[in-house]
């Protein structure tokens, strides 16, 4: 019996008496979870008209690959850092540790990308190594123009992939809201080297992410065919988009600070595809101190400007994030997250995500992994009823929205190998259909 089989058998007792995720009649379209007809089969390839996001599991960082309805593609983050050195806090590194994350991610993208190795957009949510790679961890180094480049994260993936345009919060001056190097843990230096290299090698274009913009991230191949698809930039550099389209600077009081929390600088998006809505905002969570000595919760301020969505990526991997007002504002039917640590999706976060006081509707919490140690620790907690059991074995989470946006599917795909075998799937109707 291997470690994973032992874990499966050992966890039966703690889970007895915990209900499985339930489906409200009217938002389920077919059998769910392990009984779904896709289980055991290869994940179907993207088809024109679908909006698909792959939350790629590596166990060491965050990465998402988007395929938009007309085939426009985007790699959002490509993290790698020494998470495997965290001892008992580490989660499974999959498929194995023989390759670094950047290479695994590039191989995954090439399998599912209709354009194979060509990717329209690269976007880095913020300058942290678990989202971009770092100088001290990777598949070696290379010399270029008098610089030593770390083959890690984004740069390693770019050995196989070619990006046309890149969005970054700091480009070109890297000084908003304060000089970005004051927030740097090494990832910014790594990224700036990678950008310079890819601009010279591939002619990659750089753009500053504009908070408040609608359509900066645009369909590049046949936008006219999908007028109901739009991406709105809602957060970045500590600013948020208000409902009226204006922009509020949450850090206006801190422009002379010596250091700021990089997580609060994260880039955030809301996608609308017909009736379907999706939210993602990197690690957007911070509690900066105000001039009067009190603290402001950035998620609470953002919540005032948001409406409900169908699927939401959990902020900051669920590490003491997702304030109750934000959960209540988003009211997601499905919550998902990229995970690389036992401390991700902490119990307090899960309690808020599962709170029926925040909103009464059923919901599915579908992280890339919900590790065994956490299940022992949280045995008997009510929030376990909302967690997808497929996460117990870890896997890629793939969201596929049908053409037009009326229905969507969330599937787990094995990360143990590159077979793309589906291990569980859930079908839903977008909430505003028929509203």
Kindly label every feature range from the protein language model.
Residues 75, 80-81, 271-314:
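Metallo-beta-lactamase
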Residues 297-397:
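Long, structured stretches of catalytic cores involved in phosphate-ester chemistry, encompassing
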Residues 78-81, 127, 237, 282-284, ...:
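Active-site metal-binding loops of divalent metal-dependent hydrolases
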Residues 28-52, 58, 108, 115-116, ...:
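Flexible, acidic/histidine-containing loops and adjacent segments that form or flank the divalent-metal
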Residues 69-74, 79-166, 302-319, 331-335:
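Active-site metal-binding motif and surrounding structural segment of the metallo-beta-lactamase
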